[in-house]
Amino acid sequence: MDRIIEKLESGWWIVSHEQKLWLPYGELPHGLAANFDLVGQRALRIGEWQGEPVWLVLQHRRHDMGSVRQVIDQDAGLFQLAGRGVQLAEFYRSHKFCGYCGHPMHPSKTEWAMLCSHCRERYYPQIAPCIIVAIRREDSILLAQHVRHRNGVHTVLAGFVEVGETLEQAVAREVMEESGIKVKNLRYVTSQPWPFPQSLMTAFMAEYDSGEIAIDPKELLEANWYHYDDLPLLPPPGTVARRLIEDTVAMCRAEYD
């Protein structure tokens, strides 16, 4: 599936190494390969954006290596492709040898997979399903400040789905573990690939059922009910968390304004 980049090759360039992304001038490289010293490198076509190919190059650059979070405020489709590139780059880097027999592996020519020529085992990129849920109580929404995000941002609750667990069960468990409350009338909203490191966010809305807020201090700094017209600092646009919050605010305004 990969090929040697030629001088006149053009498109969007996802240059990635160890979950980092090359972002010269803070943006994804776009244009001729020769302009970015990519001629002769191996590249894998991973998609198309605005009629042009999107290429993945597994390479480390000495300067301007940053996080894919830096392009989150760009178009959702381009952010999704950048996330795909970072995740694939990490998959290929971490699956050079077979976990069963220890022999070297090679990329499949027909799909995103790594193959072992010795024991015939086949590996695919791992995807970790997560739930994220906006909880409404009359004209208020539950927002929390997470321990791992000490930047003042308040967001909705989220967590990984455990083995043998449905998405609905994961919502109920995560909400209870992190905030001590029960929810009802769960409704699926949307999903978003989230490359931190390889998650798939499944987004829900729910209504408060019962209980008092009792946070898990290992997960949250604080959590509280916020009136829809008096919200704290929120996640950036383009995130599924922000969409859930805005959708909840819209529902509150339709009912209470």
UniProtKB/Swiss-Prot annotation:
A motif (Nudix box) lies at residues 159-180. Substrate binds at R69, E111, Y124, Q192, P193, W194, P195, F196, P197, Q198, S199, A241. Divalent metal cations. Mg(2+) or Mn(2+). Binds 1 zinc ion per subunit. GO terms for molecular function: magnesium ion binding; manganese ion binding; NAD+ diphosphatase activity; NADH pyrophosphatase activity; RNA NAD-cap (NMN-forming) hydrolase activity; zinc ion binding. A divalent metal cation 1 binds at A158, E178, E219. mRNA decapping enzyme that specifically removes the nicotinamide adenine dinucleotide (NAD) cap from a subset of mRNAs by hydrolyzing the diphosphate linkage to produce nicotinamide mononucleotide (NMN) and 5' monophosphate mRNA. The NAD-cap is present at the 5'-end of some mRNAs and stabilizes RNA against 5'-processing. Has preference for mRNAs with a 5'-end purine. Catalyzes the hydrolysis of a broad range of dinucleotide pyrophosphates. NCBIfam families: PRK00241.1. Homodimer. PANTHER family: NAD-CAPPED RNA HYDROLASE NUDT12 (PTHR42904:SF6), NUDIX HYDROLASE, NUDC SUBFAMILY (PTHR42904). This is NAD-capped RNA hydrolase NudC. It comes from Salmonella paratyphi C (strain RKS4594).
